[in-house]
């Protein structure tokens, strides 16, 4: 019986089974530049995506490039990637192709980012702090792979690893949500925490390295 229980626990770990945590009112803090600090977000369902919506909030005072959200599969880097190259310059990747959205550089911190993409038209729509930054064409007809490693805090240069400290995120991230469909972004509430793939109020995650959970400072 003891061997059976151990076997079941081992299979649960292999399958990525993690207890759900209600993160409402909390944030992940990445206190310093690092190549080892990150959080893996485990979706409720692993599936290929022909549409998706991603929303999250973040605070940082970095002036160098950094990753906000990194979604890789074993066969493709940058399946979904949110990356800031310069202040106010948001690089949004789907299937390792990129669209660049530019915002005013004097925006107040923190920022609320919402972006959606649909395969049939290839249209990516980007909103920042409740205001649209426009729509651009990106990888029309593509399907995002479903067997993914989803990481905040680092940019994956290989599946689940090969991190560069000079691209790491330093600051705070909270209210991350991912949906498997296009959500009209003008209707996404300020809380933006109820995605059907990643839900901040029922979050499956694994933290690694120097990551701290604290009550959030901002709404």
UniProtKB/Swiss-Prot annotation:
The residues that carry sugar chains are: 51
Q: In which tissues is it expressed?
A: Expressed in colon.
Location in or out of the cell: Secreted
Looking at the UniProt record for this protein, which Gene Ontology cellular component terms does it annotate, in alphabetical order? extracellular region
Q: Which UniProt keywords apply?
A: Calcium, Disulfide bond, Glycoprotein, Metal-binding, Secreted, Signal
**Molecular function per GO:** metal ion binding
**Residues reported in the UniProt entry to bind Ca(2+) 1:** 77-78, 155-157
Which superkingdom is the protein from?
A: Eukaryota
What does the entry list as the binding residues for Ca(2+) 2?
155, 157, 167
Record-linked Gene3D superfamilies: 2.60.120.200
Family membership: Belongs to the pentraxin family.
Question: What name does this protein carry?
Answer: Mucosal pentraxin
| Organism in which the protein naturally occurs | Mus musculus (Mouse)
């Amino acid at each position: 019986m003891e061997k059976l229980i151990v076997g079941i626990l081992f299979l649960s770990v292999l399958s990525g089974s993690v207890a759900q945590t209600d993160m409402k009112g909390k944030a992940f803090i990445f206190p310093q530049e690092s190549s080892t600090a990150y959080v893996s977000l485990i979706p409720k369902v692993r599936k290929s995506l022909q549409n998706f919506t991603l929303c999250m909030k973040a605070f940082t005072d970095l002036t160098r490039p950094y990753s906000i959200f990194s979604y890789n599969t074993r066969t493709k880097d940058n399946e979904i990637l949110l990356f800031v190259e310069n202040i106010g310059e948001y690089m949004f990747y789907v299937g390792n192709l990129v669209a660049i959205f530019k915002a005013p550089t004097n925006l107040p911190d923190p920022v609320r980012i919402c972006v959606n993409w649909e395969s049939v038209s290839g249209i990516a729509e980007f909103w920042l702090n409740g205001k649209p930054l426009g729509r651009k064409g990106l990888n029309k007809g593509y399907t995002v792979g479903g067997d993914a490693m989803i990481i905040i805090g680092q940019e994956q240069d290989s599946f689940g690893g090969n991190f560069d400290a000079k691209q790491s995120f330093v600051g705070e991230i909270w209210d991350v949500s991912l949906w498997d469909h296009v959500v009209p972004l003008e209707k996404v509430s300020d809380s933006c925490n109820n995605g059907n793939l990643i839900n901040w109020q029922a979050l499956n995650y694994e933290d690694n390295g120097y990551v701290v959970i604290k009550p959030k400072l901002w709404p």
